[in-house]
Amino acid sequence: MKKSSILFIVLFAFCSQPSSVDDAVDVTTTTVLNEMIIDEEEPELYVMLMWHQHQPFYTKNDDGYYTRPWVRVHATKDYLDMVELVADYPEMKATFNLTPVLLRQLEDFSNGAKDLYWYYTEINADILTQEDKDFIVSRFFDTNPKVIARFSRYVELRNSNQDSSLWTNQDFRDLQMLFNLAWTDPKYLAQEPLKSLVSKGRDFTEDDKFVLLNEHSKLIDKVIPTHAELWKTGQIEITTTPYAHPILPLIFDTNLASVGDIGAELPKNRFSKPTDAATQVEKGLDLAEQLLGQRPTGMWPAEGAVSQEVLGMFAKEGIKWIATGEHVLSKSLDIPTFKRNTK
C-alpha cells in the first residue's frame, strides 16, 4: 500500500510590477490537498499547475485612455505566450485562472481601447511637447533591468536619462520603441516583423512604431480565443474569480475577520451583504462563460479568502472546487504552518 499525494502549485503572473521573462511567475503555494491509498510500493505525486492571471481594474482618464499599461503589456509578454507554451506540449495539462476584471479589460483592448503609454508611443517624436517628453522619460523605463539589459540602446538611454534635455528627437523615438519591444515576449521578438526591429536596434522610424503597435494589437486579440480553444480541447481548465476580485467573506460579514484573526480590529459599523457576495460569484462566472464559451466549475477566491459561510455560494453556482493558500488549510486543520526545506 502506498500514499499518493496531490501537490497543488499556484503560480502568479504579477499584477503590475515589471518583471523579466525568468521572473514572470513565482511559486507561492504548495499545498497537499488530499491523500488516497492505492496498491503500489513506491509513492506517487500528482502535480497540478495553476497560473493565476489578474490585473486590477485600471481607471481611464478624461480622454478615455487607461492610465496604466499593465493589461496590454502583460498580454504581449506573458498571457499569450504562457498558454501557447502549454499548447506546444499536448500531453501537458494545466489550469489558468482568468479574473473577470482582467477579462473585461482584455476584451476592451481587443475592441480598440488604448492606454496612456500607447498614446505617448503614437505621438510623432518630432512634435512631442515638453510635457510629453517628461512623461516618456519618467515612465518608459518601467521595465525590469534584466530586460533592459538585452537592448544596448535601451541601456544607453537609461544611462543618459538624467540629461534628457540634451536628447534628440531620435532619442525619444527610440525610447518609445524600446519600452514596447521590452514588453514583448522573446518568442514574438524572434519572429517577423518584430525580428527585424530587434536587429535594427536603434534609429527607429515612425513607421516602425506603427508595425510594433499593430503586432501588439494582434497578440492581445489572441489571448482570450487561445485560452478558450485549449479549454475546449480539454488540455487546460479555466477557472475564474468573483466578479470584482473582492475579499468575499468580508462582503458576507465583516465580523468574519475575527474567525481567521481573533485580534482583528473590526469596523465600528458592521457590514454584511450576503446577497452581494453571491452576486459577485454569479457575475464572475457569467462573464467568463460569455467570453470563453464555457462556464467554469472551479474558482480562485480573490486573495484566497474563504470562509465556511461563503462555500455554499460557490456550490450553488455549480462550482466543484476552489483553491486557496496553505495558511488557510493549516488553520482549518488546526496544525502549525507548513515548513519548507530551506537547504
Regions found by a protein language model. Give the residues of each.
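Sec-dependent signal peptide recognition
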Residues: 2-9
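Carbohydrate-active enzymes and regulators
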Residues: 34-343
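Generic cytosolic/nucleocytoplasmic N-terminal low-complexity/intrinsically disordered segments
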Residues: 1-2, 33
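C-terminal motif of bacterial Sec signal peptides marking the signal peptidase cleavage site
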Residues: 13-14
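Short, low-complexity, disordered segments immediately C-terminal to signal peptides
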Residues: 19-33
